[in-house]
Amino acid sequence: YPDMTVFTTDYVIVKQGKLISGDAMLWIKRILRMPLRFPQMNDRAWLKKLAFVLGNPICCPATTYHKAALGEPFVRSEYSFALDWDNLVRLAEEPGRFICDERPLLYYRVHEDATTKACIRDNRRFEEEREMFCRFWPEPVADIIMGFYKKAYGEYE
């Protein structure tokens, strides 16, 4: 697709030497990415943004950007944790197609020194993700979603 601006794939988590490819979190992310699997429609802003209304289902290391089409700098965010989610939502509003290949083409290692764990400990992750949900939902709905979403933080323990 010559108008592709973002390409992403599924991934396998490597945690304490074990490969994880079918836990609940990964299945939820696959479901959230479904709108990006329709090539006849995945160039529409509303459909691209639909993939992000219940969280960021995209693993940044499993993502490639068409920098020439997006311009520089193509990453612009004030966030330190939710910057990928914030940036992808912004890019979804730009012309171009988001392509998702659900084959797991990346192994993603979760480890003790991961930035994600630090952001959970200092509450940065919660604050930034709540702000992102408030972009899509009224605050009471965002708080309900965060109640469920926060349970996924245990995946990093």
How should each PLM-predicted stretch be described?
Residues 9, 22, 27-126:
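Conserved nucleotide-sugar donor-binding catalytic segment
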Residues 12-13, 113, 154:
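Short, internal active-site loops enriched in acidic
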Residues 134:
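Juxtacatalytic substrate-recognition/specificity segment
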Residues 120-130, 146-157:
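Non-catalytic, C-terminal membrane-associated alpha-helical segments of glycosyltransferases
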Residues 7-20:
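Short beta-strand-to-loop element that shapes/binds the nucleotide-sugar donor at the catalytic cleft/hinge
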Residues 137-138:
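TPR/TPR-like (Sel1-like) alpha-helical repeat modules
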